Amino acid sequence: MDPSSAGAGGNSLASASCGDAQKRRVCYFYDPEVGNYYYGQGHPMKPHRVRMTHALLAHYGLLAPAKMEVLRPLPARGIDLCRFHSDDYVAFLRAVTPETQLGQVRALRRFNIGPDCPVFDGLYAYCQTYAGASVGAAVKLNHGTHDIAINWSGGLHHAKKSEASGFCYVNDIVLAILELLKLHERVLYIDIDIHHGDGVEEAFYTTNRVMTVSFHKFGDYFPGTGDIRDIGYSEGKYYCLNVPLDDGIDDDSYQSIFKPIISKVMEMYRPGAVVLQCGADSLSGDRLGCFNLSGKGHAECVKFMRSFNVPLLLLGGGGYTIRNVARCWCYETGVALGEELQEKLPYNEYYEYFGPEYSLYVAASNMENRNTNKQLEEIKCNILDNLSKLQHAPSVQFQERIPETKLPEPDEDQEDPDERHDPDSDMVLDDHKPTGHSARSLIHNIGVKREITETETKDQHGKRLTTEHKGPEPMAEDLGSSKQAPTADANAVAVNAPGNARNEPGSSPK
């Protein structure tokens, strides 16, 4: 890392180079079927955006073997998903269909399946696909043959151990981090989605082997968590950082707080690997978002993390103006590769989505920035003060490095995809063996954050420990209980059905 870059503004990617000229070994996971999954008419989440991203990458020439290794992921098996999620929740996801859901009202309520997280055709296969890609990417990083691994279909950070949330069913991020922890003593998770990364934070709230850092809109906004006072609990105290932001934050303001905080985190925590969730709903003009980042400002976070030369996993996340999402993730793939891409988009099968400007760059608007310099400075000082109290995570026994082989293609003759075995990944557990000690010790306390009571946050003399603040648990009737905005923009481009594009009336960026 170049320390002098820590104070640079969010528009520095406007220069003709990516700053760090050193090439990185990059692998990219993509399943051609992912764009076919469809949440339903009018739903903001559209997996088709991943297919649009892939098309841009292809026409920019970034899929060539000389640029990066392109891999089709193996679907995650049920037992793999259960490394984090509960058995009954995974069994429900596997069994439920649009036709059978009407008879399972109690289970739907129990697992938080509804308007935000609907049942749709191929739901379980969709979860297997994006989770398998994230875990496969983590395996590649553990092998040491790649410096950066990318899965734009992943990053679904709201899913909990036993429930869906915020368009997310399976938390592929937690599964990927558990994989990385097999080799790395400490893993850093950074979230630049506009929504708080609550599912990942909750999963690792009581451990010091994972540090979570979330930059998000805070207030009457989904999911309603992510208070700056939420700092972790027990062994995880001070290993959880929340950076609450207000509407309209622009590139320069964002980088003025992102770079100093992350620089200090990297100095104090010294992670063996970094997971960066690149939710694109923090871009200007997002259908559900209220930030004002340009595409270059968003990508500056990727560029900055790349400069540390630590194994880096790039994941997708939110993003609901899909022409912006595709351009953002294409641009960030170029940043990961150290490739400068021309501004004018090459002609591709989705070219009409990107008019009238047909530019790779997502521009910021003139919306008001409600984040004052004073507010940002106070937040930064608070976070840096918490970081000053850090102690390095204790050493753990390292596993022997896994020998590198090609990730095998799925066996199409095997009828049940949940029984396919990936010999390249030690992530796949034997059905008849108990979960390994390291995974068990990390996940047995998952859910502790939710169960912390006021009496548990008092010391032995009865004095309340206000530093161990527990953020609000949003109820169904709360303002922030649904991720879907009540209004949308008539100019937003959306997908009506898989592979069938049209303009969706009644949807607009805030």
Swiss-Prot record:
Q: Does the keyword tRNA processing apply?
A: no
Which parts of the sequence are annotated with region: Disordered?
394-510
A GO cellular component annotation in the UniProt record: nucleus
Group of enzyme by EC? hydrolase
Induction, as annotated:
Induced by drought and salt stresses.
Q: Do you know which PANTHER family this protein is assigned to?
A: HISTONE DEACETYLASE 2, HISTONE DEACETYLASE HDAC1-RELATED
Q: What does this protein do?
A: Responsible for the deacetylation of lysine residues on the N-terminal part of the core histones (H2A, H2B, H3 and H4). Histone deacetylation gives a tag for epigenetic repression and plays an important role in transcriptional regulation, cell cycle progression and developmental events. Histone deacetylases act via the formation of large multiprotein complexes.
Q: What is this protein called?
A: Histone deacetylase 3
- Name the source organism: Oryza sativa subsp. japonica
Encoding gene (name): HDAC3
